[in-house]
Amino acid sequence: SNKRKNAAMLDMIAQHAIRGCCSDPRCRYRCR
């Protein structure tokens, strides 16, 4: 249960990272 909560938080952080990585080709997250 605790792991699931951590995963959700990481997913939220990843969403922010994706938004900030639109113009950076080196970023592993991309805008969709």
Curated annotation (Swiss-Prot):
The record marks R30 as: Binds to the Glu-221 of the rat nAChR CHRNA10 subunit. GO terms for cellular component: extracellular region; host cell postsynaptic membrane. The disulfide bond CysI-CysIII is important for alpha-9-alpha-10 subtype inhibition, whereas the bond CysII-CysIV contributes to GABA(B) modulation. Changing R32Y: Extremely important increase in potency on human CHRNA9-CHRNA10 nAChR. InterPro entries: Conotoxin_a-typ_CS. Changing R30Q: Extremely important increase in potency on human CHRNA9-CHRNA10 nAChR. Changing S23T: Extremely important increase in potency on human CHRNA9-CHRNA10 nAChR. RgIA[Del13]dimer is an analog therapeutically interesting because it is the first dual inhibitor that potently and selectively inhibits alpha-9-alpha-10/CHRNA9-CHRNA10 and alpha-7/CHRNA7 subtypes, which are both involved in the etiology of several cancers. The cysteine framework is I (CC-C-C). Alpha4/3 pattern. This toxin target two types of receptors, the nicotinic acetylcholine receptor (nAChR) and the G-protein-coupled receptor GABA(B). It specifically inhibits the alpha-9-alpha-10/CHRNA9-CHRNA10 nAChR, with preference for rat receptors. It interacts with the alpha-10(+)/alpha-9(-)interface of the receptor. Belongs to the conotoxin A superfamily. This is Alpha-conotoxin RgIA. It comes from Conus regius.
